[in-house]
Amino acid sequence: MAKVMQKYLQKGNYGGKEYIKEETIQKFNTCYFCKEGNRRGVGFDKPQLGTEGPTCGCVSLTSFGHTGFTGGMTWADPDKEIVYVFLSNRTFPDSNASNKLSKENIRENIQKVIYESIIE
């Protein structure tokens, strides 16, 4: 996952090879309906527009990523040159299990610690 996100961070390039055109990454990462209150791009989720959202609130507006049903999260921040990958399986042993990841903001809190440790 980290390599995939790094490829997106590098505008479609990885290891000296172009896998996706830069224009495609740009289109995926554009928030077309932010004015209407929808923070999602075509291919990626974007940072929250208010106080609620998928990130710690410390990421740049150019950042992008995805949170998954099983609790995983990937996020890339071009301005800060950071890739964050959180893998989990909150659905094990069943999908009705408690959702502590969301309720306690575990992914977002880890992301915040990473930003505070590296950036500040």
Stretch-by-stretch model annotation:
Residues M1-E120:
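Catalytic loop of the DD-peptidase/beta-lactamase superfamily, centered on the K-T-G motif
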